[in-house]
């Protein structure tokens, strides 16, 4: 209990949960306002503190089996003060992912372990933005607001559908009159009138049908544009962790599922639903003709539905398998094209071809199974339709022979029945497409339902100066992955040039990713000018941080467009100045098109060293206050590197510079050198100071390179 008084886990939990909901919180202010006796936040004071941050909170009692239905993360409250945050429940394996506030680590608990800790009290917490985001979850309900938005167009479609159904109702009556009246009484004048009337009906029916298709296609195209635009914006707003945890081909395959949704929206599915809505009117008229024949049609409808319901789960599983195999093919194809130089150099084309053939065969086999099952489904529908037709023919003929029904009425009845059965059959067949679209929506939902980097509610501060502080940083990429950074404490002053060295995997690059706010540490704070980056607007930060990586990607544009990428309206003079600092101006001037030269896809038209120098110019052109070189000169030839190092004084002037390098000669002139090993800072100092310690890791690495 003493430890609980020393550390207020309730306050720590509130800080974490508020941060999750993009709400800024000052722990000291909360403690001052609500922890009046200094013993920590009790349940009542915790709820009041959360509400003061405009969070929606509710304390409830829930049994463990009811926790599957709550909105996570939530705070599990314990009487002894050792609260913890419940973040995820895996129903399939009965495991619980929690954040242990005492250990400051995520933990995976088995059912028995969780039962031992859980006391039945849990606090649900949301914010207005969280609730809105939840309601905006992408699934089939996403289209409801879109339909409401374009309700006028859909109402027009509905009105046109009403007239089309009225025409469909009138046409059989004309045929009945011709069969029962005109042919029997030889009424040529009546025949002429009916022919003219029927011709008018047909013309209007064709016009209205085309108009309905046009209106509907126009509205669905708008929805398609909105969805496509939303998808791309959302994709670019996703955090870097989303892309690092998924294969490129898998993401591309999910985005391409938009085509399936587009085809479904612009098809006949929804118009068939509208046609089916008018079935009650047709049933009333058909009942007037013959209750017996109507009952046959009526009883056939559940048969169509039952057959579709029977086929659907099997079809969905096979469609899911087909998608997974297609995603594997996409990933392998992207990987092969990207690594084509390696494949050619290693002469492994036959092996890659064999792998592709096997994967392609699996995909084709999965597609064939889908086709076979879809064919069985369609033929089952046809069987029901033909059976109903035979029964109606037999029963209708009996009714005509017995005098209960005229020939004209039988023909009219069959035409009306066709108006009911046709949309049912179309829907039964479209149901298979609906299964495909259901999977497409689910797959696309993986993209659209993934949380983006938060920009709203974040601090947008003035121009940064360049002071950087790492305070008690502990970080890992996944809850179950090894710790990458452990208890990092480091202060970097404005204008200081820092070199970071160490073995591969020691956490050097991860440190710079935290500066760019690609990730939030699981413990501790990254501060710039005293401002916590967890509460800062990522765009505000990244616009003022220049980064050069070992492998930089150039876009398929001109050189000037690549350098001025973040500010297309930048003057040519600034672009040229940055290029000169980066040692790129001379080779650019020698190109036929100069700065207007198109670099090709990913800069394929340039050498590795040329691409790197353009990337350095791109990082410098916005005059960032913080500059990060992550193995930036390792791909340069010695002449290019000499130009960069010669200009390093100008490059570093007025900036905080962090240089990550394996080649220690690159950092020997740095103001301070940080040596990292297994996620920890083990040494720091100037070049000569570190070499003066013969047993130091830096001396060992330097000796290896000297040899």
Swiss-Prot record:
PROSITE patterns reported for this sequence: ABC_TM1F, ABC_TRANSPORTER_1, ABC_TRANSPORTER_2, PEPTIDASE_C39
Protein name: Alpha-hemolysin translocation ATP-binding protein HlyB
Highest rank taxon of the organism: Bacteria
PANTHER family assigned to the protein according to its UniProt record, in alphabetical order: ATP-BINDING CASSETTE SUB-FAMILY B MEMBER 10, MITOCHONDRIAL, ATP-DEPENDENT PERMEASE MDL1, MITOCHONDRIAL
Sequence ranges assigned to domain ABC transporter in this UniProt record: 468-703
Subcellular location(s) of the protein: Cell inner membrane
Domain comment in the entry: In HlyB the peptidase C39 domain, the ATP-binding domain (NBD) and the transmembrane domain (TMD) are fused.
Alphabetical list of CDD domains matching this protein: ABC_6TM_CyaB_HlyB_like, ABCC_Hemolysin, Peptidase_C39_likeA
Any one GO BP annotation for this protein: proteolysis
Keywords: ATP-binding, Cell inner membrane, Cell membrane, Hydrolase, Membrane, Nucleotide-binding, Plasmid, Transmembrane, Transmembrane helix, Transport
Keyword Chloroplast assigned: no
Active site residues per record: 83
Other comment: The complex HlyBD-TolC (OMF) forms a single transport channel across the two membranes, allowing direct export of alpha-hemolysin. This channel is involved in type 1 secretion system.
Keyword hit for Ribonucleoprotein: no
Chief localization: membrane
InterPro entries attached to this UniProt entry: AAA+_ATPase, ABC1_TM_dom, ABC1_TM_sf, ABC_transporter-like_ATP-bd, ABC_transporter-like_CS, ATPase_T1SS_HlyB, P-loop_NTPase, Peptidase_C39
């Amino acid at each position: 209990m003493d430890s609980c008084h020393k550390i207020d886990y309730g306050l720590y939990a509130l800080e974490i949960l508020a941060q999750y909901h993009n709400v800024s919180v000052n722990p000291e202010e909360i403690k001052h306002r609500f922890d009046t006796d200094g013993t920590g936040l009790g349940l009542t004071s915790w709820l009041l503190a959360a509400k003061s941050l405009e969070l929606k909170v509710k304390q409830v009692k829930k049994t463990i089996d009811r926790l599957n239905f709550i909105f996570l993360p939530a705070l599990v409250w314990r009487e002894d003060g050792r609260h913890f945050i419940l973040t995820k429940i895996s129903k399939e394996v009965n495991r619980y992912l929690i954040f242990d506030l005492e250990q400051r680590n995520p933990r995976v608990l088995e059912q028995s372990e969780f039962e031992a800790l859980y006391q039945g009290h849990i606090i649900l917490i949301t914010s207005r933005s969280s609730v809105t985001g939840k309601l905006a979850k992408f699934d089939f309900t996403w289209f409801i607001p879109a339909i409401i938005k374009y309700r006028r167009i859909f109402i027009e479609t509905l009105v046109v559908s009403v007239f089309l159904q009225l025409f469909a109702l009138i046409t059989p009556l004309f045929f009945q009159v011709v069969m029962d009246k005109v042919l029997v009484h030889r009424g040529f004048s009546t025949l002429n009138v009916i022919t003219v009337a029927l011709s008018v009906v047909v013309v209007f029916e064709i016009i209205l049908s085309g108009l309905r298709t046009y209106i509907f296609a126009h509205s669905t195209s708008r929805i398609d544009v909105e969805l496509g635009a939303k998808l791309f914006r959302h994709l670019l707003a996703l955090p870097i962790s989303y892309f690092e945890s998924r294969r490129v081909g898998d993401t591309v395959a999910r985005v391409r599922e938009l085509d399936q949704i587009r085809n479904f929206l612009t098809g006949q599915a929804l118009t068939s639903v509208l046609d089916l809505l008018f079935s009650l009117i047709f049933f009333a008229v058909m009942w007037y003709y013959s209750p017996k024949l109507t009952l046959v049609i009526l009883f056939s409808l559940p048969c169509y539905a039952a057959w579709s319901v029977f086929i659907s789960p099997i079809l969905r599983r096979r469609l899911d398998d087909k998608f997974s195999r297609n995603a594997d093919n996409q990933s392998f194809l992207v990987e092969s094209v990207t690594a084509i130089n390696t494949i050619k150099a290693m002469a492994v084309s036959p092996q890659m071809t064999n792998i592709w053939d096997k994967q392609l065969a699996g995909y084709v086999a999965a597609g064939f199974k889908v086709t076979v099952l879809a064919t069985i489904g369609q033929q089952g529908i046809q069987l029901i339709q033909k059976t109903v037709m035979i029964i109606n023919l037999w029963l209708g003929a009996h009714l005509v022979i017995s005098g209960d029904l005229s020939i004209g009425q039988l023909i009219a009845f069959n035409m009306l029945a066709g108006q009911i059965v046709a949309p049912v059959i179309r829907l039964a067949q479209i149901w298979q497409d609906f299964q495909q679209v259901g999977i497409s929506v689910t797959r696309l939902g993986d993209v659209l339902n993934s949380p983006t980097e938060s920009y709203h509610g974040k601090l947008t501060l003035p121009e940064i100066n360049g002071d950087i502080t790492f305070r008690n940083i502990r970080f890992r990429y996944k809850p179950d992955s090894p710790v990458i950074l452990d208890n990092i404490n480091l202060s970097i002053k404005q204008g200081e040039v820092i070199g970071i060295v160490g073995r591969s995997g020691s956490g050097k690059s991860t440190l710079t990713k935290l500066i760019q706010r690609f990730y939030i540490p699981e413990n501790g704070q990254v501060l710039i000018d005293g401002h916590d980056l967890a509460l800062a607007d990522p765009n505000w930060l990244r616009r003022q941080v220049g980064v050069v990586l070992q492998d930089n990607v150039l876009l398929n544009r001109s050189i000037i467009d690549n350098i001025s990428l973040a500010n297309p309206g930048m003057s040519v003079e600034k672009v040229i100045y940055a290029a000169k600092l980066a040692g790129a101006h001379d080779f650019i001037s020698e190109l036929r098109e100069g700065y207007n030269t198109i670099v090709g896809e990913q800069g394929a038209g340039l050498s590795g060293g040329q691409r790197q120098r353009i990337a350095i110019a791109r990082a410098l052109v916005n005059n960032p206050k913080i500059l990060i070189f992550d193995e930036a000169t390792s791909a340069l030839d010695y002449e290019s590197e000499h130009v960069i190092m010669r200009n390093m004084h100008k490059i570093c002037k007025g900036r905080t510079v962090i240089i990550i390098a394996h080649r220690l000669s690159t950092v020997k002139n740095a103001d301070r050198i940080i040596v990292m090993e297994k996620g920890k800072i083990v040494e720091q100092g100037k070049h000569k100071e570190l070499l003066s310690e013969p047993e130091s890791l830096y001396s060992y690495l330097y000796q290896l390179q000297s040899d």
